[in-house]
């Protein structure tokens, strides 16, 4: 039987898709596509979006298919749906901006890596991007009859607190979605060598969701001439809604501006 716990209400303004027009620098505009994570919403990237917009970037942040609605709607979506939505948003930004860079949180970071391979952005910044997870996703098919829904654990109280006004996402996911996430992780990891644009990885030493070597796997795998990492100390997986948000946005903005002026 499907668990019918109450679902979240996603009508809050912070959950709505982001579009903020930026300023031209030397006659050119730089667009930033923000991609949220698995079961999350664009609200998780709202503080970073606001900070990047203040830096002059045009910022776009969609809610990926099946997110910000119901867990059952999400269960009807595939990893291809999420990748195609990310591509469509990227193309929309390309039509009005001279440069387009991508920053993604968690699964959104994996999508950023796939876009780097296929769409050739100016730069990317994967944040808390999993190259492996602490969840046994490979068990999804076997355990589905017993556990049709997987519920997220309560955050560790030892970590930095999150800003609750931006913490909008599903409390869990239908088990069948686990395979879709594992597929995106596998696809993004398989062709890291095809990523040549500048890469800034953001990861917390305290991340409770992804494998600790994820940042190292990305940095070793990509072929980028410029690549680096911003390490956070005690931030949770969704670090973009903690008091580290400004620091993250500052580092990402500086990274994107560097790429803008050094693009071949």
What are the functions of these language-model segments?
Residues 48, 197, 211-220, 231:
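Short alpha-helix in the alpha/beta-hydrolase fold that links the catalytic acid
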Residues 70-101:
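Catalytic nucleophile-loop/oxyanion-hole region of alpha/beta-hydrolase
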Residues 233-264:
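Catalytic active-site module of serine/aspartate enzymes centered on a nucleophile-bearing elbow/loop
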Residues 216, 220-238, 245:
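Catalytic histidine neighborhood in serine/cysteine hydrolases
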Residues 195, 201-203, 207:
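Short beta-strand/loop motif that positions the catalytic acidic residue
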Residues 104-108, 112:
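Gly/Ala-rich beta-loop-alpha elbow adjacent to hydrolase catalytic centers
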Residues 49-71:
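Conserved alpha/beta-hydrolase
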Residues 125-135:
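Active-site nucleophile loop of the alpha/beta-hydrolase fold
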